[in-house]
Amino acid sequence: MRHHNANRKFGRSKNQRHALLKGLAASLIQHGRILTTEAKAKELRPNVEKMVTRAKNPTLASRRLLLSGFYNNESVVTKLISDIAPRYAERAGGYTRIIKLAARKGDASPMAVIEFVQ
C-alpha cells in the first residue's frame, strides 16, 4: 500500500530524483520559467519556494545551504539572493505559478510551464 508516500518517484532512484530536482531548480532560477512535465513542476514547486524564502534572509549560513542545493553553482545562488529574493520581500509565499499546457506529442505526457510570479 502507498499510505503516507507523498513524493513522486519518477521511476528513478533517490539520488537521481534529487539530481533532477536540483537541475530543474537551477534552470528555473537562471531562466525565470521552464517547460517540463506537470508532475515534475508540481514536485519542483515546494523546493523552489523554500529556497526563495531562505534567500530572503541572506546570511552566510543560508548562502552555504543554498550552495549545497545547487552543486556549488555560485551564479545561481547569487542571482537568487540578489535578483529574485528582493522582488518577494513583502510576499509571504506563492512565488511560482504552474500553467498547464497541452499534452506532449510523443508520449501524451501532460506538460506545464513553471515560472516566477511577477
Give the residues covered by each predicted segment:
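Structured, basic alpha/beta domains of bacterial-type, RNA-associated proteins
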Residues: 1-12, 16-19, 23-118
